[in-house]
Regions:
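Active-site proximal loop and beta-alpha junction motif in alpha/beta enzyme cores
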Residues: 1-68, 74-262
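Short, low-complexity intrinsically disordered segments enriched in A/P/G/S/L with frequent Arg
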Residues: 261-263, 267, 272, 276-277, ...
């Protein structure tokens, strides 16, 4: 099985968000995919399997399978359109979040994702304790999004991972207005065994719509201000969908040699009356019953080379 390491939302290796992309020839068990994702220890490992005219796509963090992942989808598109479907400029994925289409446009890959509904919720002391700074606004959808006044607060932030676990949402994202872009953000997913996602595409299904409404723009340039950093170009399409674009860079190609473990041998449960000695007696009786006809036939047959009178 081929595995590709791709950095998403960047045009150069060792930046953006790394993802492992496995191109499979047959279905793998959930257990095997989870073990390999844990071994890779990236925020996401993607698994691709040809299905009809498209590809079945599943995403695993080191801790669990997830319903949607932006950067691993972008990475998967990069792999397929550069190494498996070079003649095409678009690829279709069948996922737990429905059918997703990604189109290659120049050097970028544009993903068509659903906008994630969200509502404003009260800012709490627990949020302030977790982030070390009090947000000016909070929104809750699949993730908790906390808005801050200054992008430097986002860059310097060192959240308490234990306290983040107690907040609502699958993960927690923080965002603020940007100086050289429309917004900066960071995303944390300790509940999924991902302390910080370097560049999170799916989080911008909430972040970008918020800033589009706040600024009156339909196109949002977002920068994820993690240590690795990455750029996302988001466009609200007005139909409950959002286009999220970015670049990608190949880092490595490898062969996965580990195989699925064989299914465990089912052992017959011993009943209360099981006794090894009794079992041995039964086996002896069975052997005697099978060999008895053969013994009698040998005794009854005349022996060659012996005269009889």
């Amino acid at each position: 099985m081929k595995q590709y390491i791709v950095d998403a939302f960047t045009d150069k290796p060792f930046a953006g968000n790394p993802a492992a992309v496995c191109v499979t020839e047959a279905p793998l068990s959930d257990g095997f995919m989870q073990k390999l994702a844990r071994e890779n220890n990236f925020s996401e490992t993607a698994y691709l399997l040809r299905e009809g005219e498209g590809w079945r796509l599943r995403w695993f963090t080191p801790g669990t399978e997830v319903d949607l992942c932006g950067h691993a989808t972008l990475a998967s598109s990069f792999v397929l359109l550069n190494y498996y479907e070079k003649e095409n400029d678009a690829v279709q994925f069948y996922t737990r979040s429905g059918t997703l289409t990604v189109a290659r446009k120049g050097g970028q890959y544009e993903m068509d994702f659903p906008v994630c509904p969200q509502r404003e919720v009260p800012v709490t002391d627990d949020m302030e304790a977790a982030f070390g700074i009090r947000p000016v606004k909070a929104l809750l959808g699949d993730d908790l999004v906390c808005v801050f006044a200054d992008e430097e607060e986002i860059r310097r932030m060192a959240p308490n991972q234990t306290l983040l676990m107690k907040l609502d949402g699958r993960g927690q994202s923080v965002t603020a207005p940007g100086t050289d872009c429309d917004c900066v953000s960071r995303s944390f997913f300790p509940k999924l065994a991902v302390p910080e996602d370097p560049v999170c595409g799916s989080a911008h299904c909430q972040i970008a719509p918020y800033w589009a409404e706040a600024t009156g723009k339909s196109e949002i340039h977002a920068y994820q201000a993690s240590r690795r950093g990455g750029h996302l170009y988001c466009r609200l399409q007005g139909n409950g969908r959002i286009a999220i674009s970015g670049e990608a860079a190949l880092v490595a190609v490898s062969e996965i040699v580990a195989k699925e473990s064989p299914p465990p041998v089912k052992r017959v449960a011993r009943d209360a009356g099981y006794k090894p000695a009794l079992l041995g007696q039964r086996l002896k009786a069975l052997a005697f019953a099978l060999l008895k006809p053969l013994c009698f036939s040998l005794v009854a047959a005349p022996q060659r080379g012996v005269r009889t009178t």
